[in-house]
């Protein structure tokens, strides 16, 4: 349940749907496994996984939702070889070349025949709806997966006025200033990893890892016009993260000490522990968002 990435969105209008109404709306789009002829299936699933029983899990007016996607695995090479074999057989028997339309029809037949025997894979994506911040945080490093989740949520609710979060000043400019100054605004602390890019399209990319970012070797690249597009940070003592210039957060990791905050509950009641961990995570992510918006100079006013 602990989020590992953040793709950030902001509501254009206040989100005021209560937990019960949200649960009802999502219920019409519940996930069901692939049938024999389904290529893929996509829908909402229990927010807390196998131990959960609701599509929405809420605490302190923060709502956790989850989507599950199942996809049949049909190797392109297998389809290609089967199609070539079938086309060659028919062309030999009928002594003619098949038209593209006929080949496409054969390909569809091959896929249909393979689907019942195909293996499938499942993936899950979670999102945290934060009405107090008018934000949605999607736990995904892929913008495509985040948009898939939002598209289904929009379909379930009828409308979903959200846009990607952006800031008043370019993030790369802010990160570059932090690196020049040798420190990030509190409560953030720079770590030992960064990616610098030239502002020119044809310019190079330089990556530093496990290196003191205050060294002259690193700062020299700023003098040549490069800007910081990725920067590893710590948020207080609770979270390690990689902040990117597109406002996404990768490699989000809650510290062991922070995650141990509910250890006194034990694991005798798994649902109680999950509920407590969700409340703990939600509160810290809200604090992180407040600090991030402040450190980056505020959200772009056109989104307000």
Swiss-Prot record:
One of its GO terms (cellular component) is bacterial nucleoid. It comes from the Bacteria. The gene is rdgC. InterPro entries: RdgC. Keywords: Cytoplasm, DNA recombination. May be involved in recombination. It is found in: Cytoplasm, Nucleoid. GO terms for biological process: DNA recombination; regulation of DNA recombination. It comes from Shewanella oneidensis (strain ATCC 700550 / JCM 31522 / CIP 106686 / LMG 19005 / NCIMB 14063 / MR-1). Belongs to the RdgC family. This is Recombination-associated protein RdgC. One of its GO terms (molecular function) is double-stranded DNA binding.
């Amino acid at each position: 349940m602990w989020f590992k990435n953040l793709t950030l969105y902001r509501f254009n209008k206040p989100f005021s749907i209560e937990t019960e109404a949200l649960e009802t709306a999502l219920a019409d789009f519940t996930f069901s496994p692939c049938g024999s002829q389904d290529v893929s299936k996509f829908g909402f699933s229990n927010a807390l996984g196998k131990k959960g029983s609701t599509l929405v899990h809420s605490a302190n007016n923060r709502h956790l939702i989850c989507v599950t996607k199942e996809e049949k695995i049909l190797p392109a090479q297998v389809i290609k070889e089967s199609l070539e074999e079938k086309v060659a057989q028919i062309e030999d028997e009928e002594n003619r070349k098949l038209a593209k339309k006929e080949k496409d029809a054969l390909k569809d037949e091959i896929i249909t025949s393979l689907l019942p025997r195909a293996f499938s894979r499942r993936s899950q994506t979670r999102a945290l709806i934060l009405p107090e911040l008018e934000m949605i945080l999607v736990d995904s490093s892929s913008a495509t997966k985040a948009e898939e989740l939002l598209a289904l949520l929009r379909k379930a609710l009828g409308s979903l006025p959200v846009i990607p979060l952006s800031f008043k000043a370019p993030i790369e400019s802010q990160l570059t200033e932090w690196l020049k100054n040798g420190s990030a605004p509190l409560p953030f602390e720079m770590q030992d990893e960064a990616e610098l890019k030239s502002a020119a399209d044809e310019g190079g990319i330089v990556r530093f890892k496990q290196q003191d970012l205050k060294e002259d070797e690193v700062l020299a690249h700023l003098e040549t016009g490069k800007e910081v597009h990725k920067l590893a940070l710590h948020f207080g003592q609770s979270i390690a993260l990689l902040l990117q210039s597109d406002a996404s957060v990768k490699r989000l990791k809650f510290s062991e000490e922070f995650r141990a905050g509910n250890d006194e509950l034990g694991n005798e009641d798994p649902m109680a522990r999950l509920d407590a961990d969700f409340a703990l995570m939600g509160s810290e992510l809200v604090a992180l968002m407040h600090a991030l918006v402040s450190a980056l100079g505020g959200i772009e006013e056109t989104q307000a």
